[in-house]
C-alpha cells in the first residue's frame, strides 16, 4: 500500500517512528496531485516549493522531540480556498479575488502549523461558498473521484474530492448550510461541522457570519477527531468564539453506544428521499440499535421551513459581507471605467459569478424597506423556532440521525439551470447551522450506481464527544471504501 492510502493518523505514527520522513510524505502527495488533479481539479493552488521548505522545518522539530504531543505532525493538509493563508493566493474560487494574497494567517492555520502540519495547497470550492456542487467556481468544476460525470458536492467539493482521491490526507473546509457534510457524503469520506463558536472564524472569508463554521474532512472519524482537537479553542479575535470545558475529543473514540438515545425525525424520511439512501440510513440505525443504542422515530417541528429561512438569512448576510469587494483596495478591478461609481459597478458585475449575484440580490431584496419585516425578521423567528425544535428533541435524545443528503452525487450540470432544486438538496443540513449545532457525516453504504451514501448525526451544542463516539462505533462495522479509480492506481 502506498503511503497516500494511509489515514492521517497512520501517517503521523509512521513519521514519528522514523519510518517515513516529512519530505517523503510531501513528495508522495505532490506526485499524486500531479498524476490525478488534471482529471479531478481539486486544487486552485499547489504550494510545492513552500511545502518542501516547511517539510524540512517540521522534520527538524520532530527530530528534536518538539512535537511529541501532536499526532498530525508532518502530515500534509489541504485548505479550502476561503481560509486565509499569509502570502498565498486565497481566491474563494472567484474572479474578484483571483489575485488576492492575504497579509495574515487564519487562526486555524496558526493552530495547524503550531501542531506541525504542512499545507500542501488550497482547494477548489463553489464561489464564495455559495453552491452545493463546486460547479460555480471561477476555476472550473471539481469532479467526483467515484464517477467523473458526477459532482463532488459543495461548497467544500475540492476538499472532499481531494481526500477521496488521495490527493490529501485530510482537509479543512467550511460549512454554512452543509458545505462540509454534503460533499463528504457525495465523496464517501467523513466530515465534521463543529458547534458554532467552537472553532475560530478569524481569517475565514465570510459568507454568512452567523452560520459559517470551519471543520475537518478526512477518511475516518479518528482523523476528524484529531484535527478538531487541533483547531478548536477560544480566540479573542473572533467575537463569537466560545471557551469549551473539554478539548480532548480523541478520548471519545470508543466503540460503545450502549444506552445512547437516538432519534430519527419522521420528516427526514419522507417525500424526495432516494429509496436507496433511506434504506442505507435505516440500516445504519439498525446497526447502532444492535450495538445497544435505543433508536426511535419521532416528529420534529419546523423541518419544512428550514430551507426558506436559511436562504433568506444567508443571502441577507452575504449581501452585506460581499459589499466589501469593490475593486478599490484588493482583488480584481475592471480595466475599463469612467468614474468611481463605474469602478464599483463594472468590477462587481465582471468579478462575481451568476450564483453569487443571485444570492446578493435576494439578500438586498429581503433587507430592503418594506420587505425587511416580511422576510428577514420572519426568517429569524423561524430560526429561533427551529432551535427550540432541536432543544425539545434533545430533551429526549442524545443524537438525531438521518440522511446527509436526499440523493447520492448528482450528474454534472443537473442543478446549474435549476437553483431551486440545488437549494432543496440542503434540506437535511441547513437546520443544523441555523441552530448552531454540531453534525457529522460518514459513509453508510453504496447505491446501485456505485456512489457513496452518507448518514448524518446531529448533537446538542458542544456535544462533539457524543457525536464522535456514535460515529466511531458505526464506522467500526464497515471498512473504508475507496473509489475504483483510486484502487486501480494503487
Predicted feature residues:
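Short glycine/serine-rich loop/turn segments
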Residues: 72-214, 267, 316, 402-420
